[in-house]
Amino acid sequence: SVLFQGPALYNSAYTNKLSIVVTPLKALMQDQVKELGEKGFISNVDYLNGDRSYQEVKNIYRKINGGEIAILYVTPERFRSRAFLNALSSRMANDHGLEYMIFDEAHCISQWGMEFRPEYLNVIKTCKKFKDTYGDDMCISMFSATVTDMIYNQINDVIPVKRLGQENDKKIYNPIRSHIKMDFKLVFHDIPHRLKEIVDYIKEHNIKSQESRMLIFCKTRNQCEEMSLLLADELHKAGILSKELSTQAIGYFHAGMDGDDREETYKRFKDNNDPLYILCATKAFGMGMDIPNIHYIVHLMPPSVMEDYLQEVGRAGRNKKMYIDAGFSESNPIPTLCLFSKDDIKKAKEQLLQSTLSWKNLEEIRIAINS
């Protein structure tokens, strides 16, 4: 994220132009704004999402118009808001455009924009209008560690892009660093068997809570909450945690939580002095979240999309000094584990097929719109 934050903040100090960062997850934008605030960028960096109150949103629109914000984080859905577009247009008219239009986790443009989140296509169309109005001075930038050749080609079909820092014929690098080891284990489909594997994993690695954190990725919000309770009980039975500590050491995190609860859980998980060191999370914690000492990752079951898996595994070992102090290195890599059953693979294929619109579906939608 510093690759776009640095230029945006530096240039804005001279041009006073606004940079927009389009990001797919609320938790991700709040994390980045919080980190910038800790570095002293308090009044000129902000975010807009559904957790903000009416008064907060109104105040941010005022700050946009007044030229007080240098970087604004938004979800793609925000570009459906007439009030937002009005505030943005007013600022752009005064400044003759934006400094940067930035797409963070840009692989989501294709992965979700084509299949699940048409809002991304709407944002790109809006960007094209901006460029038509203000010319090529407005830079559109896309950032991601997990853009495959297929996703790159899909994005390029919508809006021409150029890879920076590599030759045109050079393959995209492997986003998984050499100090991370990925293991996969075939298990029975039911939750009790998966739970036992996770307990065995925790026993085997003897996790020290004051130097390491552990993530358990679950598919659904209910799974997160259920797993946190079941695991607390099993770790108590196994003698790994006391009854009192088991209720404090394990938590859950997902986008359906109240904003304050989600923020509190994130703060606790990041604080090495807090007993919370195992977090059951959905993909809401899988992109861009920067906890420096996550040294253990387990997937309860594989994600439906490979890019999600790479992003989630990529949460591990973000701080070299911390993972070396915890005993990890290229010769003794951080252990990640993905549990899967034959039924998981079958269901993933079914979900991908169900997510594709057929001509029959499109015809039904057309009839419904016209009726």
Question: Where are these predicted regions, by residue range?
Answer:
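Conserved SF1/SF2 helicase motif Ia
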Residues: F4-N44, K131-D137, E211
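Conserved RecA-like ASCE P-loop NTPase motor core of nucleic-acid helicases/translocases
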Residues: L18-P24, Y73, I140-M142, S212-T220, ...
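Interdomain hinge/linker at the junction between the two RecA-like core domains of SF2 helicases
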Residues: F130-T133, D137-C139, T146-E204
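C-terminal helicase lobe
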Residues: H205-L231, L235-F285, M289-S371
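Conserved nucleic-acid-binding Ia/Ib motif block in the N-terminal RecA-like helicase ATPase lobe
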Residues: I20, K26-V74, A249-F253
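SF2 helicase catalytic motif II
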Residues: A70, E77-R80, F84-G135, C139
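Conserved two-lobed SF2 helicase motor
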Residues: K63-A87, F269-M289
